[in-house]
Amino acid sequence: MSRLENFLDEQNRLTAFPAKRRVKLQALCYLAQKFEPGKIYTEKQVNVLLNQWHTFENPATLRRELYQHRFLGRQPSGAAYWLEPQQPTLEELQRKYG
């Protein structure tokens, strides 16, 4: 994840959400690793967790991207989130999105 390192501070928090798709996908893979398998999270808990791992104060964008790329599942109401048991790999995402 060498390109992603350019977006991490000394505490390994994302300092910006990368614009280039390849690095953005690396960032999503990185953030997905912070969630505990089998645990159900409220939206607020997801935001708190994401806020611990980025500095640009936009958990909604990160949460939405994690959901859209199928790292996180959620109830239709958005009341509960979880780490999907089958995570997409970086290679799968890069093939899909180029």
Identify what each model region corresponds to.
Residues 68-78:
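A short, conserved structural fragment
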Residues 2-37:
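Short alpha-helical segments that sit at the start of domains
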Residues 53-65:
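Short amphipathic alpha-helical interaction segments
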Residues 37-50:
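Short acidic, hydrophobic short linear motifs in intrinsically disordered regions
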Residues 35-39, 55-56:
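Short helix-capping/hinge SLiMs at alpha-helix to coil transitions
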